[in-house]
Amino acid sequence: MSKITKIKGFADLFPPESDVFTRMESVARQVFGRYGFVELRTPILERTDLFCRSIGTETDVVQKEMYTFPDRKDRSLTMRPEATAGVMRAYIESGRHTQEPVSKLFTSGPMFRYERPQKGRMRQFHQINCEVLGPVEPHADAELVLMLMRFLTELGLTGLSLQINSLGCKECRPLYRKALSDFLASIDNAALCEDCRRRMETNPLRVLDCKVPGCRELTANAPTILEHNCPECRTHFDAVLRILDSRNVPYVLNDRLVRGLDYYNRTTFEVVSDSIGSQGSVAGGGRYDGLISQLGGPDVPGVGFACGMERLALMMPGAEAPRPHFHVAVLDPAAQDAALLLAEDLRAQGLAGSVGFGAGSIKSRMRLAGKSGARACLILGGDELAAGTVVVKDMDSGEQETIGRDAVAARLLAAGA
């Protein structure tokens, strides 16, 4: 019978990789909690229309990357390619806007996109997302960026660059779109890549986001969106920058930063690193006023960001896994019940450890204890079983002593195990 293997672009995460993800989520909860965020869990499956209406039908995500299929009643469903749309749907459906003027929500979990798998980018990937719904003020944008940078710092990441731009609003962006379209019509379109030629007709702003060197060279002199911001958008953006300056947060004004999803407006930002190759973006987000009403909800403004967990994991400094406090080495099959009960007593007092069940020589039992990484090995054989004792061996110094089984927990705790 043939062996069943995982799907291309999907990964199994064992320690230490899974430990890194757990640590990342733990730091996220600690940092976001200080800013008043609460956790929301949304379904992996959503109706396809949700993403078509939010992300945009002309985006690469909707056109080429979504895992979409009909269910048994021929309803089109999609495995979420990003989290914000699902959060907006949950926000509208729950009527949360009637319960509180501001909602601060964070989510984490797997997303799915049919892309070419590469370093830091899988077809199933994981994100941490934060959304602030309610405030229209630029202070919400700035606070979110400050929180993101604090989160990345507390993960121990260095060598990051915050890039920021303003995409304007529904009043001024059409003027920029026309100016950009006129510019693109004046250059040699045949020299652009196939995707950019398509984007010229459907979403000209996305041409600026192209990573193909030839396209970037051809559009180097394109008009910038900042030059076309209306006074209100410019005032909003200046306020965001002023707050970042006051906190001495370095940033780069990147007038080509447009992001890949259609719902963004005004402030948009991205955190990049040159240490993980071509997939240098580790986090990004922006303001999306109008998205909630576009999905059938009230006219509530919002701003948010997403962090790619696989990409963050590539940069995180290694953390030594906590050592187990004990390992019970069973030398006599008759002592297995007592070994299990001893381990349970120790765990009830907050100590972590394992039991080496099964028969074997003392040499093989000690080898198993060494592999466990435990600080102390508790040796339990026939003599110890009869006497109600256990041999406690310090796995670092090699020193050992025989004590009563009811004294083991105090002994391990006193030793700082």
UniProtKB/Swiss-Prot annotation:
InterPro entries: aa-tRNA-synth_II, aa-tRNA-synth_II/BPL/LPL, Anticodon-bd, Anticodon-bd_dom_sf, His-tRNA-ligase, HisRS-like_core, HisRS/HisZ, HisRS_anticodon. Transmembrane segments: none annotated. Its EC number is 6.1.1.21. GO terms for cellular component: cytoplasm. It catalyses: tRNA(His) + L-histidine + ATP = L-histidyl-tRNA(His) + AMP + diphosphate + H(+). Pfam families: HGTP_anticodon (PF03129), tRNA-synt_His (PF13393). It comes from the Bacteria. The keyword Lipoprotein does not apply. Its main location: cytoplasm. It is found in: Cytoplasm. GO terms for molecular function: ATP binding; histidine-tRNA ligase activity. NCBIfam families: hisS (TIGR00442). PANTHER family: HISTIDINE--TRNA LIGASE, MITOCHONDRIAL-RELATED, HISTIDYL-TRNA SYNTHETASE. HAMAP family: His_tRNA_synth. Homodimer. Belongs to the class-II aminoacyl-tRNA synthetase family. This is Histidine--tRNA ligase.
